[in-house]
């Protein structure tokens, strides 16, 4: 039906007859001439109808926005005064000779001239996706997956599919369950990741596996989370953690170079402990220059319990955050930031305004200054690197609250005060995570997943002191987003059972839930390691949006609903009966 895409026409096509198909993006009727901007997935080109082609001109008078049409015409060079430098096709136009209206369009429920609500965009997603910026994002996503496949193929990886209907296993979030008609009362689970299957593929001898795969997690959603999402899933045998990181870093660097023309350079490596200490986060945004600085040792003897209490507590922390230029913040702004940190468990926000650094305690303004002597103030100013016009905020509480509160404040201030360099790319690896964390009920839970190996510990050592174990795990972080994470896996049956035991999974449960894995570990399992990237997050970064729904063709809302199809929906009673399922309705409270 067509010979060219609209957006691909250039000067080299001048004089050629072309047939184009697409949608009317805009129409301008000048009486004897009608101009339209014709749009397809590749872009927009100007088409005009003149009186010499009377039949086409007459039909063109009926055109309205979003009519689907076919146009045949001749490509012409525009007069120099009419060249549009803002359009890729701005040096040419098409003189139409024939026009076919394939389908007319009703008035649109979306307004192309204004910002539409996200609810409207999701309800009429098929119209929203016609917008050039949305089409470009999905084209970039397709390019990314193509580049990934080429890279993985070039490095000897095999693309192997794993099951979508599998067994429910505890991986940290709730499973989406699928009832079995054949085995009434039993359920499949949609995979949260192909984790165990890719490990089994290594045990099967495939050595290098990858897959671009859908995963499902029934969890509370955030702005950058979806109930179904896509992973670039990778697993290797006989490779160390540094080797896996080197290879996956090369993959990501190649994506940025091909898609953005940016060389990311070598990724720095930072331990979990250092990231938490300096940035209050295990996914630090290194574009932001501010850092948390420990000052507890300076405040142990002050007669101010808010500081001295945590300063003398082994589980406590007192940290300072220097904000360049922050002394200009108003009282209301300071109060707002104080309320902000309360979201993260902090009780408030002490501060020092530095007006004249050279005067020491005489050159500051602070509601806590009366508790501090000149020597302490000077030490704080020196340690934080404070200068005239700076603000120093303090966090004093248990270590987690201080890290969470000041870490979040650091990000907010970086954005509010334009301290974060938005034009910069800041990738890094975070390594050496704790293997376990407190589950809040006196037990331990795996920080990554139960199949991650410990670093430099055997089973007996791990059993004796699990809370000290460091996981052989690694996360890739770019601009404050965790884009990928992985680990060296356990390849010993004894070690795997030890980890299960530490997590409170008894031997009977181990057999019921993971018997197939424990059996497989008996037969010469190779050392193996892997990683999974979030394709949606990578695409989000590479297309410059901060909304993950912008890079998914048909996403769900934060309530896990599809506004377009109205999923989820009630099932047919006959289908439920066939599955042996009764729906228990909640009683409505009066």
UniProtKB/Swiss-Prot annotation:
- GO CC list: cytoplasm
Which EC number(s) are documented for this chain?
6.1.1.12
Residues annotated as binding L-aspartate are 171, 217, 448, 489
Q: Which compartments is it annotated to reside in?
A: Cytoplasm
Q: Which domain of life is it from?
A: Bacteria
- What GO terms describe the biological role, i.e. biological process, of this protein? aspartyl-tRNA aminoacylation
Keywords of the record: Aminoacyl-tRNA synthetase, ATP-binding, Cytoplasm, Ligase, Nucleotide-binding, Protein biosynthesis
- The record lists ATP as bound by 217-219, 226, 482, 534-537
Per its record, the protein catalyses:
tRNA(Asp) + L-aspartate + ATP = L-aspartyl-tRNA(Asp) + AMP + diphosphate
Q: Name one GO molecular function term.
A: ATP binding
Q: For the region Aspartate, what residue ranges are annotated?
A: 195-198
Q: What is its main location?
A: cytoplasm
User: What family is reported?
Assistant: Belongs to the class-II aminoacyl-tRNA synthetase family. Type 1 subfamily.
Q: What does this protein do?
A: Catalyzes the attachment of L-aspartate to tRNA(Asp) in a two-step reaction: L-aspartate is first activated by ATP to form Asp-AMP and then transferred to the acceptor end of tRNA(Asp).
Subunit structure, per the record? Homodimer.
The name on file for this protein is Aspartate--tRNA ligase
Species source reads: Enterobacter sp. (strain 638)
Classification of source organism = Bacteria, Pseudomonadati, Pseudomonadota, Gammaproteobacteria, Enterobacterales
């Amino acid at each position: 039906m067509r010979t060219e895409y609209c957006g691909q026409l250039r000067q080299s096509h001048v004089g050629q007859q072309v047939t184009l198909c697409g949608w009317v993006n805009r129409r301008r009727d000048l009486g004897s001439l009608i101009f339209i901007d014709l749009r397809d997935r590749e872009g927009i080109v100007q088409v005009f109808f003149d009186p010499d082609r009377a039949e086409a001109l007459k039909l063109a008078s009926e055109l309205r926005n979003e009519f689907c049409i076919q146009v045949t015409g001749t490509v012409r060079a525009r007069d120099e005064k009419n060249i549009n430098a803002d359009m890729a096709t701005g040096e040419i136009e098409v003189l139409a000779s024939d026009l076919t209206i394939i389908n007319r369009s009703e008035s649109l429920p979306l307004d192309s001239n204004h910002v539409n609500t996200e609810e409207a965009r999701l309800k009429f997603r098929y119209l929203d996706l016609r917008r050039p910026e949305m089409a470009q994002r999905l084209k970039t996503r397709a390019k990314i997956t193509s580049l990934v496949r080429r890279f993985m193929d070039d490095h000897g990886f095999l693309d192997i599919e794993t099951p979508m209907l599998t067994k429910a296993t505890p991986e940290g979030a709730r499973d989406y369950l699928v009832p079995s008609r054949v085995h009434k009362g039993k359920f499949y689970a949609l995979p949260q990741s192909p984790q165990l299957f890719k490990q089994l593929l290594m045990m099967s001898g495939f050595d290098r596996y990858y897959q671009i795969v859908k995963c499902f997690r029934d969890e509370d959603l955030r702005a950058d989370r979806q109930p179904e999402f896509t992973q670039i899933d990778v697993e290797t045998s006989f490779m160390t953690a540094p080797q896996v990181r080197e290879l996956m870093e090369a993959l990501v660097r190649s994506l940025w170079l091909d898609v953005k023309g940016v060389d990311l350079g070598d990724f720095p490596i930072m331990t979990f402990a250092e990231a938490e200490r300096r940035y209050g986060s295990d996914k630090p945004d290194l574009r932001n220059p501010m850092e948390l600085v420990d000052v507890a040792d300076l405040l142990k003897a002050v007669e101010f319990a808010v500081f001295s209490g945590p300063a003398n507590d082994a589980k406590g922390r007192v940290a300072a955050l220097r904000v360049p230029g922050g002394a200009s913040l108003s009282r209301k702004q300071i109060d707002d930031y104080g309320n902000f940190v309360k979201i993260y468990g902090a009780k408030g926000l002490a501060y020092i305004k530095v007006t004249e650094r050279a005067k020491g305690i005489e050159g500051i303004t602070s509601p806590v200054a009366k508790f501090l002597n000149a020597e302490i103030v000077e030490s704080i100013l020196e340690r934080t690197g404070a200068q005239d016009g700076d603000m120093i905020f303090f966090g004093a509480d248990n270590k987690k609250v201080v890290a969470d509160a000041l870490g979040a404040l650091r990000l907010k201030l970086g954005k509010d005060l334009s301290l974060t360099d938005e034009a910069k790319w800041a990738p890094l690896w975070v390594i050496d995570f704790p293997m376990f964390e407190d589950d809040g009920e006196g037990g331990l839970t795996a920080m990554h997943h139960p199949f991650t190996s410990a670093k430099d510990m055997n089973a007996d050592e791990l059993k004796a002191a699990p809370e000290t174990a460091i996981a052989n795990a690694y996360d890739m972080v770019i601009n404050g987003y965790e884009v990928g994470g992985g680990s060296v896996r356990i390849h010993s049956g004894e070690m795997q059972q030890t980890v299960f035991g530490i997590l409170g999974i008894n031997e009977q449960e181990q057999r019921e839930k993971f018997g197939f894995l424990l059996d497989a570990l008996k037969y010469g399992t190779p050392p193996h390691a892997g990683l999974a990237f979030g394709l949606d997050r990578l695409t989000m970064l590479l297309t410059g949006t901060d909304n993950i729904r912008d890079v998914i063709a048909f996403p769900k809302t934060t309530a896990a609903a599809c506004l377009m199809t109205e999923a989820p929906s009630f099932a047919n009673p006959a289908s439920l009966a066939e599955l042996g399922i009764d729906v228990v309705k909640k009683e409505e409270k009066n």
